[in-house]
Amino acid sequence: MEMLYGIMPEISLLLSALIFQLIGAYSNNTLTHVIAKMAIGFAAILIAILVFHPSWFNGIYWNNTFIVNQSKIYLKIIILIFYIFLTLIYSGYIKVANLKGHSEYIVLMQLGALGGLILVSANDFMVMYLGIEMQGIIGYILTTFNYNNSRSSEAGLKYFILGTVFSAIMLFGISLVYGTTQSIRYDIALHALQNPSSDMAVLVAAILMILVGVLFKLSIAPFHMWTPDIYDGAPLVVVALFSSLPKISVLALLGNLLSELKFASDAFFYIKTIIMVLACLSLIVGAFGALLQQSIQRFIAYSAILNLGYAVLALVANSSNVIRAEISYFYIIIYAASMLGFIAIIINNFTNRANYLKISHLSGLSNVKKLSSILIAIQMFSLVGIPPFAGFISKYIIFTSILKSGMYELIIMGIAAVVIGSYCYLNIVKVMYFLPATVRFQNSSVNFELSLVSIASTIIVISLMIICMLFGEGLNVIV
């Protein structure tokens, strides 16, 4: 029985998802709002238990294949908080759009959160594959959720084909790892790189295959090709999901893998260099790609590529065999909060037109929706990295860490990406405040759920900066 304690949050999420699905099926989706409230309440209880009783779950389970410690509990709490935000966004969306709603959407999101929790604690390649595939399959389904729209169906098919190809590459890599090391545990398989053997080339190739699958999920160039089309075709509420839960959990997975790889110093140096180059390529692709976009959803896609480039760079951009995971996680949390707040405001103000909206449609928004415009401006300023918002401190930490490592060429590239990205984000502020309106805005009532997400995300990007300023010593430790 003690072996089940470590996965009680995961078991609880799975069982509650099954209960919510049964309620939705027998009520013919008439209780979607009730199910949403139940899901939020359940996640809040789970967060409270993890916060106040973390010792209940700490431990190493099933022969070191599943690990729960304090840092992993923090990540699980963050994933559950973003799951609550996503449920609020969907609940608010079906209210403002006057839709019946589908309880299975909430269930699928909850299973996506479950996959994220599994990825955070996985110390075994098959457990990792289970978590990634759980999130992947849910992503395929949700992309096509607007099944009456051809763009949504096309995006879902593209995502499914590309996702299965990269999943197969990852699975082939896992099989080669087992064939060469007789183990699929991270610590045993990856530490085998310390001992030169005739199978070394095969093992390195296998690890690179696994990392290719992980970088695909993170939209790191050149494995980003799916991101703009899928974001553009999926409903905006699904884009909100793609911008948060999978990115946080898969980044945590990459941090776990690199933390074990660092013990094989020679192989780790080359693998780290490859990832660093790809992260820099993501900065270029994301910055210039966002520069050319008119569609808000494609803009969000290239923004994801750009910001994941920074997050991955934060993991590996140092001169020693050290993984700065806390810097990377801090950055991606701020990015995800800013993007969810932005998406919630768009849905709240444009309702049925929120999907496939263009940046030009935001022109003149400040004349009609002053508070919404202020909140969007704050999110954009944070994404640019303008003080006093948290986006500034996250970029400052990354650049300071790189500077201490003496990698000045990365500093130059990072600053160039910031400058180009600044134009993209500030262009939205310019459109809202300085261009005349091109569409008629609806004088709809303010939705509570969407407003709560937009305000909460704004509080996050402001309060994290204040916390860092008040606790300067803690900040110095991170840097």
UniProtKB/Swiss-Prot annotation:
**A GO molecular-function descriptor:** quinone binding
Locations listed in the record: Cell inner membrane
- Which stretches are transmembrane? 3-23, 40-60, 77-97, 102-122, 125-145, 159-179, 200-220, 234-254, 268-288, 299-319, 327-347, 373-393, 409-429, 452-472
Domain of life (superkingdom): Bacteria
Q: Which GO terms describe its biological process?
A: ATP synthesis coupled electron transport
* E.C. no: 7.1.1.-
Protein function: NDH-1 shuttles electrons from NADH, via FMN and iron-sulfur (Fe-S) centers, to quinones in the respiratory chain. The immediate electron acceptor for the enzyme in this species is believed to be ubiquinone. Couples the redox reaction to proton translocation (for every two electrons transferred, four hydrogen ions are translocated across the cytoplasmic membrane), and thus conserves the redox energy in a proton gradient.
Q: Describe its assembly.
A: NDH-1 is composed of 14 different subunits. Subunits NuoA, H, J, K, L, M, N constitute the membrane sector of the complex.
**NCBIfam families hit by this protein:** NDH_I_N
Q: What is this protein called?
A: NADH-quinone oxidoreductase subunit N
Record the organism. Answer: Orientia tsutsugamushi (strain Ikeda) (Rickettsia tsutsugamushi)
